[in-house]
Amino acid sequence: MIQSGCSVAMSNAIVCQRVSRAPPGAVQREPVRLRCEDGQYLDATWTWAVPQPHAVVVINAATGVARRYYQAFADWLAQRGYRVLSYDYRGIAGSLHGPIRHCRASMADWARYDIAAALATAAKLQLPILLVGHSAGGNLLGRVPGLQQASAIVTIGAQNACWRLWSGWRKWGLALVWYLALPILTQAYGYLPGRWLGASGQSLPRQVARDWANWARRRQYVFDAPGLPPARYSEFAGPVQVWSVSDDSYAPPAAVADLARRFGPGGGTLLSVSPAQLGLARIGHFGIFRRQIGMHLW
C-alpha cells in the first residue's frame, strides 16, 4: 500500500529518499495536544524513528475508532522514514472531555476543525504530507479546509455510505440502521453506545451519530451535505489511491468506487485487495490496520 525508497506507491508527488529501516526499538512516540480553530483540544501522538523524516503521514481514523488502533501502522511507517501524526477526533477516546451525554461534538466538526487541525500541524514541518483516511477519515477529506496542503491521499474502506449503494439484504438492513435503529438508540441513551459499532468499541456523541445517519440517508452522503466547508474533492491535484477490501461489508465496491470518482480531474486510482490474495481467511473493514493482517499489505 505504501512503499519507501520510491514515490509512496502512487506517483512522484511525494519523493522518498532511500531510507534504511530503523533498528528494532528505535520508534519514539510523543503524546501531544492539537489546538483546533474553535479552541477545542485533541489528544494526539507523534511517532517517528529517524531524525530527518522524508514525509509526514497523518492518519485520519474511522468513525468511533481511537488512534491507538492505528499505532502498529504508525510504528511501521516510522521505521521507514516517515513522521506520523495520529489523533482522536473530538468526543472519541482521549479527546472526550467529560460525560459523553454532555458532548456537543458533531461529525461536521471532525471535518471542519479536527482533520483541519491535524493537517495544519503536519504542514508546520514543511515536508510532503500524505493523508491516510480510514472509512470516514477518507470520505470526509474533501470537506476539509486547507486540503491543498496535502501532497497525496490514500483511503482504505472509505465510501459513500448511502444505503442505496449496498445490494441484497444488506441494503435494506442498512436502511433500517440509518432510519430507525441509530436514531432510536441515540435518543434512548443520549449517545450511540460503542457496542453497536462492532470492532471499534468507542461510543459516539449524539450529534456525531445524527450527522452520520442524516448524511447516509442522502444519495450524495457527505459530498454535498449542508453546514460544512465547500466540497474540494475534484480540486485536489495530488495522487489519490482509493482501496477497497473484497470482504468489507461496511464499504462494498460500488460505494468505494463512488468516492474514488470524485477526487481530482480524473478520479482517484481505485484499487482492491482480497483475503485470498494475501493468504488470509478474512480482512474485513478493520483488519488492514491490525499488525498480523496489515503486514501482508503495508
Predicted segments, located by residue:
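Active-site glycine-rich loops that stabilize anionic/oxyanionic intermediates
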Residues: 62-65
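Short beta-strand/loop motif that positions the catalytic acidic residue
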Residues: 236, 242-244
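Conserved alpha/beta-hydrolase
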Residues: 67, 74-98
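Alpha/beta-hydrolase active-site loop
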Residues: 104-123
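Catalytic active-site module of serine/aspartate enzymes centered on a nucleophile-bearing elbow/loop
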Residues: 273-298
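Alpha/beta-hydrolase-fold enzymes
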Residues: 132-220
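Short alpha-helix in the alpha/beta-hydrolase fold that links the catalytic acid
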Residues: 252-262
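N-terminal cap/lid segment of alpha/beta-hydrolase-fold proteins
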Residues: 12-48
